[in-house]
Amino acid sequence: NQLTGSSQHVGNFPGVTVDRKDGSIRGKSNTLVTDLPGIYSMSPYSSEEIVTRNFVLNEHPRGIINIVDATNIERNLYLTMQLMELDIPMVLALNMMDEVRENGGSIIINRMEEMLGIPVVPISAAKNEGIDELVAHALHVAKYQEKPEKIDFCDADDDGGAVHRCLHAIMHLIEDHAQEAGIPVRFAAANAAEGDQLILEKLKLDQNEKEMLEHIVKQMESERDWTVRLPLRTCDLILLKKSAMRQSLSPKRARSISEVQR
């Protein structure tokens, strides 16, 4: 609503927006903003997730504004990592910064930007704070197609490198299929490992490739002693929480938005 000047219904929880809604950014009639349902993952298990995922995968937007609740960043990390795998220019908007301030918290923005390799903009949609900066960053990354850095969160040295080897083996196995299906290979590999049937159908693997995929996944499961049907990106989440991004969340420090560090 702040971007387009519309009065659509908004809320704090996923599912409020049932379908996509389009509008132009105020003062910039040559732009198009598509409001998609709020979700916490790109898994196709709810109508909201299906609407959002189909749009992002099939309509190839020039940029994404990923709006995250700044009071509960960790809950949105999984979706953020999935979006980064799509190789689409993205800006991370930390909304509800007014509540962060009121609760005596601070977020070190430059550490998040360094960790994720994308612009991070603190905003308060309710108080119209940071919206102009958000629009400027979004238009810039869309115009110049500045895509997220390719970050391998699960590096070869983490926990024996089982997830790293699994993902890269699957990427090598499915690369040609993913390109033909128009799906970014890292996103396709992680979702295939997690048993995403819609992605597997689009990849059109032959029987031998399906058996190789299953073998790779079982090998990783045996090395890590867990089931990959839990989100494979759990590894990424653990690393992020141990990283500078986790360290950037420091309660009871900032007293005003001017103290939110860049």
Feature annotation, model-predicted:
Residues S6, G15, G38-I39, A70-E74, ...:
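Conserved nucleotide-binding/hydrolysis micro-motifs of P-loop NTPases
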Residues K28, V51-V121:
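Conserved C-terminal guanine-recognition region of P-loop GTPase G domains, centered on the G4
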Residues N1-P44, N58-E59:
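Conserved G1/Walker A P-loop phosphate-binding module
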Residues N1, E113, L139, M171, ...:
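Residue-level preference for well-ordered alpha-helical positions
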